[in-house]
Amino acid sequence: MVWENQTFNSIFILLGIFNHSPTHTFLFSLVLGIFSLALMENISMVLLIYIEKQLHTPMYFLLSQLSLMDLMLICTTLPKMIFSYLSGKKSISLAGCGTQIFFYVSLLGAECFLLAVMAYDRYVAICHPLQYTILMNPKLCVFMTVASWTLGSLDGIIVLAAVLSFSYCSSLEIHHFFCDVAALLPLSCTETSAFERLLVICCVVMLIFPVSVIILSYSHVLRAVIHMGSGESRRKAFTTCSSHLSVVGLYYGAAMFMYMRPASKHTPDQDKMVSAFYTILTPMLNPLIYSLRNKEVFRALQKVLKKRKLI
């Protein structure tokens, strides 16, 4: 079969997002700094939640999974881009491209479902506080997390199988800084309309369904917050929920703009900018949004630093 040979023989060229002009060199240095900061933030968040017993709650367990997904996402896309820019070697095999696509799509899907689970967690905590330990028991929490990872991986497998089944007979230059499906489709000489319809279905499942759960959850949360008698309780609930909604808005807004548009509306430069937003900036911003506005995380961090005599 054609694709079996291409898996090992096809070599693509990732054109990247930067050239070597002074302005682009500065921007590359900025991205490198953001990458380093995102690595440090997300690793710290995962370790902090694992180490500190006061953070061993469903909300923080889910937050640790979000940080782990962000960590894996940024490590899927950026190291190759950084290596290509520094070495000048922009080639990538179809197998390497497929690996990027699988992890990228899987992590995007898993994060979509996880954000919906996090919204449900806030709904239970605020609307049914007395039943929280029952409705969000450890077994259910782990089950929903595993389901998020599994559904994301299934989506990655479906997309990967389709991408490897295509034959590529036009220019093998990918106008992107990583192997994104939208950038790879124009290079195929195989009819892709059926796959594009499948991609729309996957986007509906991964984006529209979780967003519906989030909107429904927060409509109940907003109603409950408005009727809270204590100003302090209202402020704490609003702070926690606004952090989550900020992450949801950043992530889903960029993802929907990227994948829910008609193919005719896509342009390489625009796609690269939007992809950079949720594969580079969002993994860096998420830990900041949660940690800077969360006193429990801040206190836990201070406690860990004091234990190690760093402050």
UniProtKB/Swiss-Prot annotation:
Membrane topology: Multi-pass membrane protein
SMART domains (alphabetical): 7TM_GPCR_Srsx (SM01381)
Record localization: Cell membrane
TM region positions: 26-49, 58-79, 101-120, 140-158, 196-219, 237-259, 273-292
Broad class of where this protein is predominantly found: membrane
UniProt GO molecular function: G protein-coupled receptor activity; olfactory receptor activity
Cytoplasmic-facing ranges: 50-57, 121-139, 220-236, 293-311
Gene3D superfamilies: Rhodopsin 7-helix transmembrane proteins
GO cellular component, one term: plasma membrane
Disulfide-bond pairs as recorded: C97-C189
UniProt-annotated glycosylation sites, renumbered to this chain: N5
Cleavable signal peptide: none
GO biological process, one term: sensory perception of smell
Pfam families per UniProt: 7tm_4 (PF13853)
Extracellular-facing ranges: 1-25, 80-100, 159-195, 260-272
InterPro entries assigned to the protein according to its UniProt record, in alphabetical order: GPCR_Rhodpsn, GPCR_Rhodpsn_7TM, Olfact_rcpt
UniProt keyword terms in alphabetical order: Cell membrane, Disulfide bond, G-protein coupled receptor, Glycoprotein, Membrane, Olfaction, Receptor, Sensory transduction, Transducer, Transmembrane, Transmembrane helix
Family note: Belongs to the G-protein coupled receptor 1 family.
Purpose of the protein: Odorant receptor.
The name this protein goes by in its record: Olfactory receptor 2M4
